[in-house]
Regions:
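N-terminal glycine-rich phosphate/pyrophosphate-binding loop and immediately adjacent elements
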Residues: 3-134
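Core beta-strand elements of the Rossmann-like FAD/NAD(P) dinucleotide-binding domain
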Residues: 261-271, 275
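Flexible loop/turn segments at secondary-structure boundaries
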Residues: 37-39, 193-194, 249-251, 279-283
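Conserved acidic residues
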Residues: 4, 258, 270
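Generic, well-ordered alpha-helical scaffold segments in large soluble proteins
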Residues: 15, 24, 172-176, 185-189, ...
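Helical element adjacent to the flavin cofactor pocket in flavoenzyme catalytic cores
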Residues: 206-257, 263
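Flavin (primarily FAD) binding-site architecture
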Residues: 274-290
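Rossmann-like flavin
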Residues: 93-200
């Protein structure tokens, strides 16, 4: 009989974990406290209008394709994408708006308008960013991170300086550009990481490659289409999704989870995966002993 796994939270992380576990042969139940799946990416409807509650941009389309390919699927099996042009607009002030073009030649021309000669530096910047993206995704992000030994690789160690691990993003950008608006354009993607450019390694200019080279996309029908796609995939794989089930407690014995308690039900488990907010699980669900 297959082992039972309970996944807490039906956001992107919880749904992705559930799909992978189900494919591996586990009997998976996902518990979601809200009445709809999606977590921070859930949807809200009122008076005939529909609102995405969380993410508004679709970057790094290759990551989504890679996820669905793991199950023999494509994103286009579930939703259609449109590349946005302009990618987005930045409002520096009431009369100061920068429309960032999707076309690379138009992007170079825009940089020239703000700072003559800067397009040459942008090409250099994006060439370096492409290398960081390819190495960063293959050798860091896509590794399971079970052990630090995964990263003890002579090739990686040699590439540390090219990845600019010891230079800040702020310093890196200012070495190539002087215009205030261009600097702010190139620095803002690292804010998605929850850090400031001054305290973020320049390796994360890989985010600029994702932005300017891979583009900003939007699923037709809204970002919630991604959630619907992942829910559909999970159900195709046999995942049991239970809504309105807020986890109150995890029971354990000999250091192993045995049962998950919600407001009105109990779920036996051989393993539990926490896909909800770490702080909430740590402070509100787990006991100090756990």
């Amino acid at each position: 009989m297959s082992k039972k796994v309970v996944v807490i939270g039906a956001g992107f992380a919880g749904l992705a974990a559930a799909c992978c576990l189900a494919k591996a042969g586990y009997q998976v139940t996902v518990l979601e406290k809200n009445g709809v799946p999606g977590g921070r990416a859930r949807q809200y409807s009122a008076d005939g209008f529909v609102f995405d509650m969380g993410p508004s941009w679709y970057w790094m389309p290759d990551v989504f394709e890679q996820f669905f390919a793991h199950f023999g699927k494509k994103t286009s099996d579930y939703y259609q994408l449109q590349r946005l042009d302009p990618s987005y607009s930045i409002f520096f002030g009431e009369d100061e708006v920068m429309h960032v073009p999707a076309n690379m030649e138009e992007l170079f021309a825009m940089f020239e308008r703000y700072e003559p000669g800067s397009s040459r530096n942008l090409k250099k910047f994006l060439e370096e960013a492409k290398y960081k993206y390819e190495v960063g995704m293959a050798d860091f992000v896509n590794k399971p991170s079970h052990s630090m030994l995964e990263f003890v690789d002579l090739r990686l160690i040699k590439s540390m300086f090219r990845l600019q691990m010891f230079t800040s993003m702020s310093t890196h950008v200012r070495q190539l550009f002087n215009n205030r608006q261009l600097i702010e354009l190139l620095e803002f993607p690292v804010l998605f990481l929850g850090a400031t450019p001054a305290k973020t390694p320049a390796m994360y200019s890989l985010m600029n490659y994702a932005d300017m080279a891979l583009g900003t996309w939007y699923p037709e029908g809204g970002m919630y289409k991604i959630v619907e796609a992942m829910v559909s995939l999970a159900r195709e794989l046999g995942v049991d999704l239970q809504l309105n089930q807020e986890v109150k407690q995890i029971l354990s014995a000999n250091g192993l989870a045995t049962k998950v308690i919600t407001q009105d039900r109990e779920y036996t488990a051989d393993a539990v995966v926490g896909g909800a907010d770490y702080h909430h699980l740590d402070q509100q669900v787990l006991t100090p002993e756990q």
